[in-house]
Amino acid sequence: MAHTSNHLFILLLLISVYGFLGHKKNYVTVFYGIPAWRNATVPLFCATTNRDTWGTVQCLPDNGDYTEISVNITEAFDAWNNTVTEQAVDDVWSLFETSIKPCVKLTPLCVAMRCNNTGTNTTTKPITTPITTTKPSENLLNDTSPCIKNDTCPGIGLENTVDCYFNMTGLRRDEKKQYKDTWYEKDLECNGNSTSTICYMRTCNTSVIQESCDKHYWDSLRFRYCAPPGYALLRCNDTNYSGFMPKCSKVVVSSCTRMMETQTSTWFGFNGTRTENRTYMYWHSKDNRTIISLNKYYNLTMHCRRPGNKTVIPITIMSGLNFHSQPLNTRPRQAWCWFKGNWIEAIREVKETIIKHPRYKGTNNTERIRLVGPSAGSDPEVRHMWTNCRGEFFYCNMTWFLNWVENRTGTTQKNYVTCHIKQIVNTWHKVGKYVYLPPREGTLSCNSSVTSLIANIDVYYDGNDTKTNITMSAEVGELYRLELGDYKLVEITPIGFAPTEIKRYSSTTPRNKRGVMVLGFLGLLAMAGSAMGATSLTLSAQSRTLLAGIVQQQQQLLDVVKRQQELLRLTVWGTKNLQTRVTAIEKYLKDQALLNSWGCAFRQVCHTTVPWPNETLTPDWENMTWQQWEKRVNFLDANITALLEEAQIQQERNMYELQKLNSWDVFGNWFDFTSWMAYIRLGLYVVAGLIVLRIVIYIMQMLARLRKGYRPVFSSPPSYTQQIPIRKHRGQPANEETEDEGGNEGAYRSWPWQIEYAHFLIRQLRNLLIWLYNGCRNLLLKTSQILQPALQPLRLSLAYLQYGISWFQEAIQAATRAARETLANTGRALWKALRRTAEAIIAIPRRIRQGLELALL
């Protein structure tokens, strides 16, 4: 038995030693260049191949290198909650507003005008062709239709214009002058009578209207967005992506988006870059808003024309204020647009795509899905298809077109529509603001490819039937959610923390030799799907590539800002380029400042002396990515950062003290008075300490000598001078001693003055203690006497409260006992009743049998 116990003891001892030696403490290690990121909202900048247009004069030159690298990660994407799409909407609006350049206030034109509703230029009725006499073939145009060239297709009339006269002070403020102006009928509000009509410019009472003072017109621009240095763009490359996907597994990374074109229109999107040989849609995750990309196979196009030979002249009203007017000799014909392509099949495919969408809950019958326009009470930009053609705003009535694509019997079906032109329009980005555009001279024509459809999917119940309306929408911003909704802007966070067993200033660990990896700037995130262990071995090459890419992009931005410094005020891109430059510099300096504050400047792998704060949280170097690890330790970042800064401060303090000691190696420092003062002060402290030590030793020696003699403790001071010393018995001295000799050294010698001084100290200390005791006792007595009246009600209240609590406890206990007894009695009674009922039910067959037996007997 003892032998077994010894074996167990030895085994436990070995296990303890092995555990002590095998357990190694982990320390915080800083890694620079890891493939990790977080969502960002910094400004993007533009790149374009066309540097001739005014809107892109400040964009970076696009070299056509649109590189995308696949990343083995899973990321969430949302086209509506997306900083890329929001920036696109804001920037395009800024370009749109800059192109108009509103600067001349037209508030002085809010005067009463006398307008004609008679005459050759205003009374001509629109040229229309009755539906009954129009052949069906004439309602559908093609490239060979003769009416296209002359703008005489059935249903296209003359534009409703009005000549108005008004009086206003001109260059001479004391004299009024009569002016003549021609207006579109839709831009006036009139009250007519038999003789004349009094009209006002529309929206005079709601807004300050401004007219363009520069001849810029809104032309489409092609450009792409690029991320600032230190940032990247992730894109969901999944064909099933429909505007919202919390886990997209097919992700690519790039530094720029695809090329896109500025679009400002309702109902349809024109000249988009997302068209494919399929129809797909983006659906809002919490709403019925959608944007549908049309199949390019059907070759859908729209051709718009504004006939006429207009001239534009400035009218000087008041001093230095010019207003662009449009005198007309004859009424112009209406603007109109016609649609080419297989629209009927395209809309049928749109309906089938809606049915297949997982969020759709309506009918599966395409005959019950209709393409409709918005309600009649909406704004003109919503009720009509609103677009811009060479500076003129077209408001097109789409009833004929909807009747055609839906094949509505009994209605007018045409593949072209008539459009009205308005110069006072509602803005599409800021509610309630109006702008005024001067018309462009001559005949205008615009040709566009129709690439998308903006709509709301409305499911409703008509009796027992479920129907669906594809209601056309005026959300211009949806066009850019289709163009850029699959992108996501992220900030690369190259600094990461992980626990390792290596402490700072330890010997260098052996590293595996690997081939040099040539990575571009995007190659940093290409390693995002790799394990942490494999990624950490290539941090040197990655960090060098990262820094090189940041420096290169910064240099490009700096060059373009320097070259076009005088044009920064023209467009939004000048400001965004400067913001991007500042953002890049701030990010780089911030990372380097953090590394420097931890003592890890210009290091890819930096070991520290800070212990890892959570020993239970360690990474799986072979199976875990850096992005996954960063999400797990995100809550430790603040704590680790503070610990690293404290450790670095302590190290710098130690280095400072060491350098102060090393400074004595220089001969000249010996003559520095400030250095000597510290040592002089230290010497004074040493002398004072020696004096105090000497006093303590003296007191201890005096007390030791007092213990050798006898004296009554409470005797009076003179008594110890009369004390009879007790001598030790000793024999006759060997030699005769004279009076001058000191006698035997072992004889007792009394020191009366030391004893008297000690007695005096004891008496004073005793008096001091008695005084302190009496003072404290008196203070406590007075305090208790003062607090007694105030504490008495409190004590009484506490007694009442204690009594109430005890009574409440007893009441609860009594109620509990009563409830328990009641429940027990009720349960027993219920159980007896149930048992009797069950016995009665069980006895029924026996009673029946007994009854039958009695009946048979």
Curated annotation (Swiss-Prot):
The ranges of region (V1) come to 115-163
- The keyword DNA damage is annotated on this UniProt entry: no
User: Residues with S-palmitoyl cysteine lipidation?
Assistant: 776
Which Pfam families does this chain map to?
A: GP120, GP41
Q: What Gene Ontology biological process does one annotation of this record name?
A: clathrin-dependent endocytosis of virus by host cell
- Report the GO terms under cellular component: host cell endosome membrane; host cell plasma membrane; membrane; viral envelope; virion membrane
Q: Which residues form a coiled coil?
A: 627-648
SUPFAM superfamilies, A to Z: gp120 core, Virus ectodomain
Q: Give start-end of the signal peptide.
A: 1-26
Q: Where is this region: V4?
A: 396-419
Q: Which GO terms describe its molecular function?
A: structural molecule activity
Show the disulfide pairing. Answer: 46-59, 103-213, 110-204, 115-164, 226-256, 236-248, 304-337, 389-446, 396-419
Q: Where is this region: V5?
A: 464-472
Motif Di-leucine internalization motif: list the residue ranges. Answer: 856-857
Q: Which stretches of sequence are listed as region MPER?
A: 660-681
- Summarize what the UniProt record says about post-translational modification: Specific enzymatic cleavages in vivo yield mature proteins. Envelope glycoproteins are synthesized as an inactive precursor that is heavily N-glycosylated and processed likely by host cell furin in the Golgi to yield the mature SU and TM proteins. The cleavage site between SU and TM requires the minimal sequence [KR]-X-[KR]-R.
Extract the ranges annotated as region (Immunosuppression): 578-594
Positions bearing the site annotation: Cleavage = 514-515
Topological domain (Cytoplasmic) residues are 704-857
Extracellular face residues: 27-682
Location of region: V3 = 304-336
Q: Where is this region: V2?
A: 164-204
Task: Give the span(s) annotated as Fusion peptide.
Answer: 515-535
Add the further remark from the entry: Some HIV-2 isolates have been described that can infect cells independently of CD4, using CXCR4 as primary receptor. These isolates may have an exposed coreceptor binding site.
Q: What is known of its domains?
A: Some of the most genetically diverse regions of the viral genome are present in Env. They are called variable regions 1 through 5 (V1 through V5). Coreceptor usage of gp120 is determined mainly by the primary structure of the third variable region (V3) in the outer domain of gp120. Binding to CCR5 involves a region adjacent in addition to V3.
Spell out the protein name for this chain.
Answer: Envelope glycoprotein gp160
Q: Which organism is it from?
A: Human immunodeficiency virus type 2 subtype B (isolate UC1)
